[in-house]
Amino acid sequence: MLVKWEGIVIRSVDYGESSKVVTMFTRENGKLGVMARGAKKTKSRLAAVSQLFSHSYYLCKAGPGTGMPDLSQGDMLDSFRDMRQSLTATAYAAYIAELLDRLTQEREPNPYLFQLLLHTFRHLDEGRDAEILCRIFETKMLIVAGISPQLTACANCGEQREPYAISVGQGGLLCPVCLPSDPYAMAVTPSTWKLLRLFQVFDLERLGDIEVKPATRNQLKHVLRSFMDEYLDLRLKSRSFLEQLERMERMTQSDQD
């Protein structure tokens, strides 16, 4: 049986001398793995559509009892060429793709996540702020994972009393009265927790230019990574590379200053 899916490649692994196992996130069926036979050959009609980040329509042979579907052909919609040509944007895209891959199961339809990934890649391709796009994506993936921070009131007492700190252990904001309950709570500026709260409900399709101070960027990253490290315990290869790249960029900026 031939089936047609709209998907974005989030992982591609060599298989044998000439083929690839391609993992795509589809609009219709969520995450799927397909066999792209001969895709490693230079002249293969599957070479382009099986590349990482490719957004295409895919025609596959699938059916009950047939195992992994075979990719028959693809119709490229967007290769995100400009994103690929930027080392920074590519590094963030790889991290975003791996994070999505690790936090989703196969064949669980989620059109919202497909749209989130698509709009994130489109914004990266347009040269938007890759770091902020990544923070927005991380915030929304915490919701998917069921560990989204409580950011509307104190997670301990439910009262709305500022200034807030953020407690990973208690799952969100802590008011001044409850702050002693967690000696490891993180002091954050109002801008940080308000941006995180905005990111939780923000429609990425409407993204404009967002100006975020370096100190706030650092706090956003620290809070989100702390929640992921505490509750998800992910070991992402792309995150290690991204952090190396960020360190190099900070060193370059420091030398220029």
Swiss-Prot record:
Assigned keywords, A-Z:
DNA damage, DNA recombination, DNA repair
Q: Name one GO biological process term.
A: double-strand break repair
Q: Which domain of life is it from?
A: Bacteria
Extract the Pfam families matched here: RecO_C, RecO_N
InterPro entries reported for this sequence: ARFGAP/RecO, DNA_rep/recomb_RecO_N, NA-bd_OB-fold, RecO, RecO_C
What NCBIfam families does the record point to?
A: reco
Q: Quote the protein name from its UniProt record.
A: DNA repair protein RecO
The organism named in the record is Brevibacillus brevis (strain 47 / JCM 6285 / NBRC 100599)
* Gene name of this polypeptide: recO
